[in-house]
A protein has these predicted regions:
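Short, basic/aromatic recognition patches
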Residues: 1-27
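Zn2+-dependent cytidine deaminase-like catalytic core
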Residues: 2-5, 12, 39-153
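Short beta-strand scaffold segments in enzyme catalytic cores
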Residues: 27-41
Length: 153
């Protein structure tokens, strides 16, 4: 058996984290890592105390969830950021994994942060965002988080 690279290792953990999601369409997992240590994890799920997605009629409608701006889920990245302190996140890496609930296969867009999550990631001081395609965002010398790869939709 081949030993996974460090990025593969953390992406595998992000996949395992995603399996906690109750979403009926897609599972997302996020792992925040700093200096080789996991500081936080998150998966897409409704806010604490609210009904799980199993009761969501939007998912049962057969429509593409991207059209549902009112989806109650808190994104994986948001949950990971909420669970970590700002000092821990400064300079940390964020690993993202996304999977289809039906097939268990990685989703085509390879787990990219939405615009709101990207704003939170920038403000949290996260240094890099990594998905299956590799490093997709990285903070430049001027401190700005910039895309390194084009998003696939």
């Amino acid at each position: 058996m081949k030993r996974p690279s460090i990025d593969e290792y953390y992406l595998n953990i992000a996949k395992a984290v995603s399996e906690r999601s109750t979403c009926l369409k897609k599972w997302y997992g996020a792992v925040l890592v700093k200096n080789g240590e996991i500081i936080s994890t998150g998966y897409n799920n409704p806010p604490r105390g609210e009904p799980h997605c199993w009761t969501c009629t939007k998912c049962d409608s057969g429509k593409d969830m991207a059209t549902f701006a009112t989806c109650p889920a808190v994104h994986a990245e948001m949950n990971a950021i909420i669970s970590a302190s700002r000092n821990e996140m400064l300079g940390a890496d964020l690993y993202l994994a996304g999977y289809s609930v039906k097939t268990g296969e990685p989703i085509e867009c390879e787990a990219w942060p939405c615009e709101i999550c990207l704003r939170l990631i920038k403000n949290a001081g996260i240094y890099r965002i990594i998905n299956k395609k590799g490093v997709i965002y990285m903070r430049s010398e001027d401190g700005i988080l910039k895309p390194l790869k084009e998003r696939i939709n």
